[in-house]
Amino acid sequence: MGESYRIVLRTYAKLNLCLDVLGKRQDGYHEINSLFQNISLFDEMDITLSDGKGKLLINSNVNIGNNILNSVWELVNCDNKNVYVNLQKNIPMGGGLGGGSSNAAGFIIALEKVGIISKEQSLKIAQKVGSDVPFFLFGGTAIVKGRGEVILPVEPLTNFGKFKVDLHLPNFSISTKEAYSKLKAEWFGKAPITPEELYDFYKTRNFEMIKKGTYNIFERVIPMDLLEKIESLRRDFPAALTGSGSTYFALKEDGKYSFVPKGVEINAFEKS
């Protein structure tokens, strides 16, 4: 009989503190330039691996359809273990918070932890299943370029004091594919400052410049009533859409959520 494992972990949501698109690539993807940050909103995953024939069973509190975890498991191509995943979704789906990508990263990290895949394989699988997934393998704070696969980890902003945010969750989701299709070339590269500059302003807690640099290109293609809500917040706080929406955030001293220094956190690991 082989070994069985149980891994319990949290996978944290992310914000794009700024998000610009620099152009469309020859492969059809868009070149992004962004500052990513994990926040304290998280999903919970309870993963059990035991001897079997390569089956994956996912149980969740919401209807997750053809989940990204299936794509990960297909690429792993393991035929001597069965996996059961209990997934408690707290991160809204389709809102630009990276919940599915964080789940995929958590699953990949768990499979690496038990020795089914190597660290090198982890990154390759992450790059194949979703543009945001590689970030969550590093987590915390990072400058992200390319189509999301170029990760430049930087010292977590949590090392420079507390940052808190409020999230605003409209009751509709926005298709990322559709949002990208609406972008116009003349909008590319128009962010007021670079992600590197914005990161430095966060480090020095220069909130006036943080407010100036909090930018998201996708605000150009969202419904007008949503944009008006963001701009109303922006009069007093750094505020923007995250991802392609529909969630938007505002940096506030009394915000409900905090910046966190990791994308995935293992809370329990059992071997039998």
Swiss-Prot record:
InterPro entries: GHMP_kinase_C_sf, GHMP_kinase_N_dom, IspE, Ribosomal_Su5_D2-typ_SF, Ribsml_uS5_D2-typ_fold_subgr. It catalyses: 4-CDP-2-C-methyl-D-erythritol + ATP = 4-CDP-2-C-methyl-D-erythritol 2-phosphate + ADP + H(+). The active site is at 14, 132. ATP binds at residues 92-102. GO terms for molecular function: 4-(cytidine 5'-diphospho)-2-C-methyl-D-erythritol kinase activity; ATP binding. Its EC number is 2.7.1.148. It comes from the Bacteria. Pathway: Isoprenoid biosynthesis; isopentenyl diphosphate biosynthesis via DXP pathway; isopentenyl diphosphate from 1-deoxy-D-xylulose 5-phosphate: step 3/6. The keyword Cell membrane does not apply. Keywords: ATP-binding, Isoprene biosynthesis, Kinase, Nucleotide-binding, Transferase. One of its GO terms (biological process) is isopentenyl diphosphate biosynthetic process, methylerythritol 4-phosphate pathway. Belongs to the GHMP kinase family. IspE subfamily. PANTHER family: 4-DIPHOSPHOCYTIDYL-2-C-METHYL-D-ERYTHRITOL KINASE, CHLOROPLASTIC. Catalyzes the phosphorylation of the position 2 hydroxy group of 4-diphosphocytidyl-2C-methyl-D-erythritol. This is 4-diphosphocytidyl-2-C-methyl-D-erythritol kinase.
